[in-house]
Amino acid sequence: MDADSLLLSLELASGSGQGLSPDRRASLLTSLMLVKRDYRFARVLFWGRILGLVADYYIAQGLSEDQLAPRKTLYSLNCTEWSLLPPATEEMAMQISVVSGRFMGDPSHEYEHTELQKVNEGEKVFDEEVVVQIKEETRLVSIIDQIDKAVAIIPRGALFKTPFGVTHVNRTFEGLPLSEVRKLSSYFHFREAIDLKNKTLLEKSDLEPSLDFLDSLEYDIPRGSWSIQMERGNALVVLRSLLWPGLTFYHAPRTKNYGYIYVGTGEKNMDLPFML
C-alpha cells in the first residue's frame, strides 16, 4: 500500500484484520516520509508485517520512477528506525529452503542446519556432518522476494509501459468498472512478465501493449489459489491469497484506491494443492 495514503489504505484493508495500533500508525506516517526523502524514492510502499515469536518485522519498499525496476526493501522493529536489506539472490533461496517454522524477530538470530559433505582423504571418500548457520536476515530477504514474485498484484491499467520500455504509474487510472472487478484477468502480478513471453502472436493479438504487459492472475497455478470477495455493499473488492496466507489485496472500484498488504508468519501453504 502506498505510504502517501497510508491511513485510508489501512482502513480499506482492515476487513481482513490487518490493523495497526494508533502509535504504530503515527510512527509509520512520519518515518516513511523520511525514508522517501532520505533515499530519494519516487514512491514508498508499506509492504506489511512478518510476525515473529519475539518481535515483528515491519517491511517497507522504495520504488524508482520505473515501477518494475528492482525495489529497495527496508525493515524496522519499531516503525521508526529503518534498515536496508540486501537484494535477494538464488543462493539465498537455496540456503533458506532447509529452514522451516516461525521467524524469531531477531535479524542476528542464526538457524543451524546439519548437512552431509563429501570429504577426500587420500584415496578414501567419506561423508562428514557439517553444521551450516543461516542468518534470519537472509531468510527475511528471501521470503519477501518469494512473496513479491508470487502474490504482489495490481489492477489492470494501474501502470502503463512507454514505447521505450519504461513502466510508469498511470495518472489517468480511475479504477476498475464493477463489471470487471470479479475477474482474475483484471489483476496482474507486480513484477516482470514470465508467462506472457510464452504466448503465441495469436494470443497476444487482443492485448493492449501499453497496459497488458504483465502476467494475469487468470492462469496462476494452482488454480483456485485466490479468493475474491465483494465487501461494503460492492464498494470494495478484496482478493486473498491462499498460497501465502496473510496477503490481502483491496480495491475500491471506480476509484484510484488500491494496494496490498501482507500480515503473516512468512510461511507458504504447501498443502494448498491437496486442499482445493
Swiss-Prot record:
Coiled coil residues, start to end: none
PANTHER family assigned: MITOCHONDRIAL RIBOSOMAL PROTEIN S18, RADIAL SPOKE HEAD PROTEIN 9 HOMOLOG
Knockout-associated phenotype: RNAi-mediated depletion in the ependymal cilia results in a near complete central pair apparatus loss and alters the ciliary beat pattern from planar to rotational. Multiple radial spokes proteins, including those in the head, are markedly down-regulated in the cilia.
Tissue: Expressed in the testis, trachea, lung, oviduct and ependymal cells (at protein level).
UniProt keyword annotation of Nucleotidyltransferase present: no
UniProt name for this protein: Radial spoke head protein 9 homolog
Role of this protein: Functions as part of axonemal radial spoke complexes that play an important part in the motility of sperm and cilia. Essential for both the radial spoke head assembly and the central pair microtubule stability in ependymal motile cilia. Required for motility of olfactory and neural cilia and for the structural integrity of ciliary axonemes in both 9+0 and 9+2 motile cilia.
Major localisation: cytoplasm
Compartment list: Cytoplasm, Cytoskeleton, Cilium axoneme; Cytoplasm, Cytoskeleton, Flagellum axoneme; Cell projection, Kinocilium
Family from the record: Belongs to the flagellar radial spoke RSP9 family.
Lineage: Eukaryota, Metazoa, Chordata, Craniata, Vertebrata
Gene that encodes the chain: Rsph9
Assembly: Component of the axonemal radial spoke 1 (RS1) and 2 (RS2) complexes, at least composed of spoke head proteins RSPH1, RSPH3, RSPH9 and the cilia-specific component RSPH4A or sperm-specific component RSPH6A, spoke stalk proteins RSPH14, DNAJB13, DYDC1, ROPN1L and NME5, and the RS1 complex-specific anchor protein IQUB. Interacts with IQUB. Interacts with RSPH3B. Interacts with RSPH4A. Interacts with RSPH6A. Interacts with CFAP61. Interacts with LRRC23.
GO cellular component: 9+2 motile cilium; axoneme; extracellular region; kinocilium; motile cilium; radial spoke; radial spoke head; radial spoke head 1
Keyword field: Cell projection, Cilium, Cilium biogenesis/degradation, Cytoplasm, Cytoskeleton, Flagellum
InterPro entries the record matches: RSP9
GO biological process terms on file: axonemal central apparatus assembly; axoneme assembly; cilium movement; epithelial cilium movement involved in extracellular fluid movement; flagellated sperm motility; mating; radial spoke assembly
